[in-house]
Amino acid sequence: MGTDTASPDTRPYHVMRRIFEEGFATGDTSVVDELCSPGLVEHQFGLAATGAQAREHVKAAIRDVHRAVPDIWFCIEDFAEQGDKIWVRVRARGTATGPFFGPPSNKPIDITVFDLARVADGRIVEHWGVPDRFALLAQTGQLDRLAR
């Protein structure tokens, strides 16, 4: 049986957990500099870019999420790792007390996010993210507003 020599803090699961808990949940963008490679390749719709621009897009997303839902918390409900890749299914909950495609709704949100990341040396080098934006729009009442 092989021995895993990777430090617990650099394993893909721990890197992903930290980006959610220390970044998105708190609004602290400094975690991006620590956990995302300078050459990050970001594929997520609305954030897609490479290098410094990709890292700035992730920082902006952290600020936007935290501004819209300051009490947000994340729970990794499922994950799978293969080589340097990790897939996670994350549950995000909170209250939309900040602006999100319109004025604050003050409604609770509970959405799922699927992420795939490639992690090397404790840093995210490539990322694909699929947050359930439709559920978010519906739960905050923005979908009804847009349908009018």
Task: Describe each model-derived feature in a short phrase.
Residues 1-148:
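C-terminal and inter-domain tail/linker signature
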